């Protein structure tokens, strides 16, 4: 058997390492970029054939090709493989095919999925279960096959689900869906269909927890699993309370809107799995939210600073704005072909001043109209401008609405840079 790897990112690296231990086969790695010396040494030591700097028709000789999730469907090699009837799969699909589905909890959504996944892992672990945290969240799922776990809590991206041919999940949570990654997917419909692929594979006895406001899920005819919506009269959250199965519980802290939605969604999932919520609320007290997600940094001269660098879509930005009355908003990064006219219409009542830099400024600028705004060159200038146009009591919010890759390695580096500038200006950290 000959197994190919199209792209050699984190997930395919982990899969190859697993297969080298557990499967007799010939392996072939095809990477568009240049491989580093350490990677080449590893491949050569294990007699793995490889090519770099582009893809060739050698992949056609493989019985199955595992696709790195980030590779776009319209790349020429994908089109060639598809036209020749090649079998395409993913590291995620390999994992799902080799594990008890009842132990897997899959979580997806446009915004909040990393936090929700981390929260579910936290409450399961603290309850005494051996829980694996991974998927799109850090560790590739296939690495869990080397151990024994009670639960596998996986964050799942639209890219992973798109390339996985049959991602069956016994427990599936969908937080929300809005326009995102339209620079990757051919349409919003394709993006939604990718996110929801597991729903239509579920059978009786499986669990599906979902946001009632997702338009595509208004008609669930043909879905055979147990369907539990939230943001309903039975399951919803206020600033201070959590209502699950119609029963009221006091939230153990003050949470911004997106975190409240995460807590609500995971609490409904937890209730359906364990039929009680008291232990969840106790364990929630000790959960530390992930950085760069509505992270309160502190004050400078009475101004309040929030780092929401993980907000890479306009839907996420609107969620952040919903927590405040008026905001000095910093947006930056690479946009995702969203409806910016609609975004500005919804955001404008919350904006005291909009500061933009990076590629997204070109896409936003035509729609800002009479909203006070500034276009600057970088984060330092954005920070200085925010101080200039704000006054004591104002909120200064970094919520970019775009991917970080035009100027930063990732969203975390972008958020850390914002925090560094905050400290440099004498920020009074919490």
UniProtKB/Swiss-Prot annotation:
UniProt record, GO biological process: cell division; cell wall organization; peptidoglycan biosynthetic process; regulation of cell shape
GO cellular component, one term: cytoplasm
Chief site of localization: cytoplasm
Annotated catalysed reactions: UDP-N-acetyl-alpha-D-muramoyl-L-alanine + D-glutamate + ATP = UDP-N-acetyl-alpha-D-muramoyl-L-alanyl-D-glutamate + ADP + phosphate + H(+)
Binding site for ATP: 109-115
Enzyme class: ligase
Disulfide bonds: none
Pfam families, alphabetized: Mur_ligase_C, Mur_ligase_M, MurD-like_N, MurD_N
One GO MF term: ATP binding
Keyword Transmembrane helix: no
Organism domain of life: Bacteria
Key words of the record: ATP-binding, Cell cycle, Cell division, Cell shape, Cell wall biogenesis/degradation, Cytoplasm, Ligase, Nucleotide-binding, Peptidoglycan synthesis
Places the protein is found: Cytoplasm
UniProt keyword annotation of Ligase present: yes
Pathway connected to this protein: Cell wall biogenesis; peptidoglycan biosynthesis
E.C. numbers: 6.3.2.9
Annotated family: Belongs to the MurCDEF family.
UniProt function note: Cell wall formation. Catalyzes the addition of glutamate to the nucleotide precursor UDP-N-acetylmuramoyl-L-alanine (UMA).
Protein name: UDP-N-acetylmuramoylalanine--D-glutamate ligase
């Amino acid at each position: 058997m000959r197994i190919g790897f199209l792209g050699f990112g984190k997930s395919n690296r982990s899969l190859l390492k697993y297969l080298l231990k557990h499967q007799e086969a010939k392996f072939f790695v095809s990477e568009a970029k240049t491989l580093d010396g350490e990677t080449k040494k590893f491949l050569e030591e294990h007699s793995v054939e490889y090519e770099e700097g582009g893809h060739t028709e050698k992949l056609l000789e493989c019985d199955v090709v595992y696709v790195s999730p980030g590779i776009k469907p319209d790349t020429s090699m994908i089109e060639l493989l598809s036209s020749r009837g090649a079998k395409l799969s993913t590291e995620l699909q390999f994992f799902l095919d080799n594990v008890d589905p009842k132990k897997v909890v899959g979580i997806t959504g446009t915004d909040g999925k990393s936090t929700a996944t981390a929260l579910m892992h936290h409450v399961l672990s603290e309850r005494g279960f051996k829980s694996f945290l991974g998927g799109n969240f850090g560790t590739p799922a296939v690495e869990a096959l080397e151990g024994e776990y009670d639960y596998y809590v996986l964050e799942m991206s639209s890219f992973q689900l798109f390339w996985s041919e049959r991602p069956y999940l016994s427990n599936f949570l969908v937080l929300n869906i809005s326009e995102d990654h339209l620079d990757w997917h051919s349409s919003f419909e394709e993006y939604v269909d990718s996110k929801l692929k597991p729903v239509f594979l579920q059978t009786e006895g499986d669990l599906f927890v979902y946001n009632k406001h997702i338009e595509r899920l208004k008609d669930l005819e043909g879905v055979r699993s147990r369907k539990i919506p939230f943001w309903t009269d039975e399951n919803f959250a206020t600033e201070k309370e959590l209502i699950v199965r119609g029963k009221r519980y006091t939230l153990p802290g003050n949470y911004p809107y997106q975190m409240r939605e995460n807590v609500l969604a995971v609490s409904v999932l937890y209730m359906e799995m364990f039929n009680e919520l008291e232990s969840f609320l106790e364990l929630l007290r000790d959960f530390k939210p992930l950085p760069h997600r509505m992270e309160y940094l502190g004050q400078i001269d009475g101004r309040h600073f929030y780092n929401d660098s993980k907000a890479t879509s306009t839907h996420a930005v609107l969620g952040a704005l919903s927590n405040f009355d008026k905001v000095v908003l910093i947006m930056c990064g690479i946009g995702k072909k969203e409806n910016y006219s609609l975004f500005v219409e919804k955001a404008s009542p919350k904006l005291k001043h909009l500061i933009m830099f990076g590629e997204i400024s070109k896409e936003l600028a035509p729609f800002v109209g009479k909203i006070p705004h500034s276009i600057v060159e970088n984060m330092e200038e954005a920070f200085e401008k925010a101080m200039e146009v704000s006054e004591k009591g104002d909120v200064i919010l970094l919520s970019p609405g775009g991917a970080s890759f035009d100027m930063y390695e990732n969203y975390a580096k972008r958020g850390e840079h914002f925090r560094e500038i905050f400290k440099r200006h004498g920020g009074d950290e919490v």
